[in-house]
């Protein structure tokens, strides 16, 4: 029986078409797998103080605005998800409101962002979130509620021991003075650390108002304290602990956090 040319062509082409279909399907599946393997954005917590009174002076205090707005700007530019936390949750009072600072002005003009500082999430409610980094903003208020808060200490230990970055600036390192690892060692022990210095506290005439001298306390915990001249930038990076001396250091601390996070392999 003679086979028609068209039938012969179909017979020869069919295996090729099947093979092409299989290759295309495999490529599609590979592409889908690659897309699903893209790492989610990093997630960072900025922790603010709830404390609003400067000791017995009846003067207001809180978190120092630029020490939150400058890091927020850096983390936002890096594409990170950012949560605002505080020890108790709810309002975190602002201090150091200076609209001549562009980062402050942009933050204050964003009603949604300002609202988030008035309704922060309590650290206790955020403990199940796998943060890549936690950043403790400064401000004198931190000297009263950060050091002895169990949720602050637990958050630091959890993030650090999971391989994340712990960061703080100015008076934010008040969160570190009682923070211990599971081994019982202070996190700051034998690490380079910077913070608002005792000399700077004297310069702003608040050494008799704050409950303790931050630099001295960190040194007592075994930190290798490093500093710049008063009110000049100083950032210390020691393993996955990043600290800064004062408001001038806030951007540098955040940039160092980003550098550490971006150096990690995807999924690590």
What are these regions (language model features)?
Residues 26-162, 166, 174-268:
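Extended, subdomain-level signal for the structured scaffold at the beginning of enzyme domains
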Residues 2-14:
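Bacterial N-terminal signal peptides that target proteins for export
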Residues 11-24:
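Bacterial N-terminal signal peptides
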Residues 170:
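Catalytic, metal-anchored helix/loop core of enzyme active sites in primary metabolism
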């Amino acid at each position: 029986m003679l086979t028609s040319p068209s039938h012969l062509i179909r017979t020869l082409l069919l295996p090729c078409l099947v093979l092409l279909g299989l290759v295309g399907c495999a490529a599609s599946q590979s592409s889908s797998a690659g897309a699903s393997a893209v790492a989610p954005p990093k997630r960072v917590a900025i922790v603010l103080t709830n404390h609003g009174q400067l000791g017995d002076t009846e003067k207001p205090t809180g978190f120092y605005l630029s020490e939150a707005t400058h890091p927020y700007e850096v983390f936002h530019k890096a594409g990170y998800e950012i949560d605002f936390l505080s020890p108790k949750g709810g309002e975190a009072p602002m201090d150091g409101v200076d609209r001549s600072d562009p980062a402050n002005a942009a933050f204050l003009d964003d009603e949604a962002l300002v609202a988030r500082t008035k309704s922060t999430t309590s650290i206790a409610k955020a403990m199940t979130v796998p943060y890549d980094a936690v950043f403790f903003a400064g401000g004198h208020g931190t000297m009263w509620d950060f050091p002895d808060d169990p949720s602050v200490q637990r958050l630091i230990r959890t993030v650090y021991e999971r391989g994340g970055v712990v960061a703080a600036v100015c008076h934010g390192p008040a969160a570190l003075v009682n923070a211990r690892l599971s081994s019982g060692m202070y996190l700051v022990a034998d690490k380079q650390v910077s913070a608002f210095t005792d000399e700077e506290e004297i310069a702003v005439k608040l050494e008799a108002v704050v409950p303790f001298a931050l630099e001295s306390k960190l040194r007592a915990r075994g930190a290798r304290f490093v500093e710049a001249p008063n009110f000049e930038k100083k950032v210390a990076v020691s393993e996955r602990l990043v600290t800064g001396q004062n408001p001038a250091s806030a951007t540098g601390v955040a940039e160092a956090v980003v550098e550490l996070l971006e150096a990690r392999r995807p999924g690590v």
